[in-house]
Amino acid sequence: MEQVNSKRTYLAIDLKSFYASVECVKRGLDPLTARLVVADESRTEKTICLAVSPALKALGIYGRARLFEVYEKVPRGSFIIAKPAMADYLQVSSEIFAIYAAYVATEDIHVYSVDEAFLDITSYLRTYEMDAEQLARTIIKDVLGHTGITATAGLGSNLYLAKIAMDILAKHQTADLDGVRIASLDETSYRKLLWQHQPLTDFWRIGPGISKSLHNFGIYTMGDLARFSLTASEKLYRKFGVNAELIIDHAWGIEPTTIADIKSYRRKDHSISSGQVLATGLYFEKLRNILIEMADKLCHELHEKQLLTNNLTLHLSYDKKADSTSVKPFAHGSKSFSYTDESNLIIEYFLQLLAQILDPTRPVKKLSLTLGHLKPVDLITTQLDLFDNQKITERASRNQNLEQATLKIKQKYGKNAILRGTSYLEGSTMRERNQQIGGHRA
């Protein structure tokens, strides 16, 4: 286990019930007292609530509840249902980032999600002549003053401890009058305060699967895990592979990764994918149109990123309600081919795969498309058939010109500026999806 520099100070900030708070502020309501959920009720009462205000959480309704579960606990008409407005949330998030950047250089900020960020405030404590909690409270109060949104914060000697202080300690503290909670941890206090904490799933990066596997070793707390690692770490490596190092480090309160490390990391995209849960189960003809739209959108992403693919995968999940038989509930297939970015070719390959794997007597409720083995255009030399060199080259050139022209039109006028004819057929979802962010209306 590598020791980290304990002299650094990190601040983790989680904006409280962010989507719900934005909707409350838009309506002139107090985010801490208003009863509001963010959900698209047009998707039926089974739709998942993207956010729940603190006042409703106090009644036992938590984030990701389904709308009918809210109705079971709170009378209809006694709370507000706000339709998701993702563009608004992104706008407010960017405004809050600007507030962070007024205190800390952008290279010392890591945006973890739309409502959560990490700041390395080490070198700023002397600048502002504040201790860590004073600076944290100053930043959070500034966010509150400008946006009406409060936050929970954690301070730590590394990124992990800052997040755990926020996730576990701060969220169980009594809030101040503005709803702000701040907690702090270093390696020593972490072991003192949280080595006996249960359940393990409260800790960052430990989900139900890992927790169950640890239970099989007789490990129920981080203290158990730390002690187990002293004498039987090889068992953890056999079970979890390279991830064992991370969970062992975290058991001891160690996290060597810094914000600078995160900033310098460049992810290599090996695949891109698109999935969709359909409003109702569809059979071949209508499903075919949806697949064409989704494949076309993936190809658009290929062209934007200037990538080529030589492999695709299609996964179908059948509608359980319409088909309660015990036969396999899904279909799956893949296809390999020469590297290309030609939309027509890729769509045709997806259609061939659909015809191969689909049971035409069963409606499909979910589908997922993936393009794999991605490579940059300039790294791939197309292997052309000896006798068809000129013909294939000319076709590829024409298609590439068409793809680039289409891309420019969409970039300038929007994704719905130019569409395939299938996008205007009954049952098409592309026009609506093009106006969404993260699967929800912008």
Labelled PLM ranges:
Residues 22, 328-442:
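Acidic, metal-coordinating catalytic segment for phosphate/diphosphate chemistry
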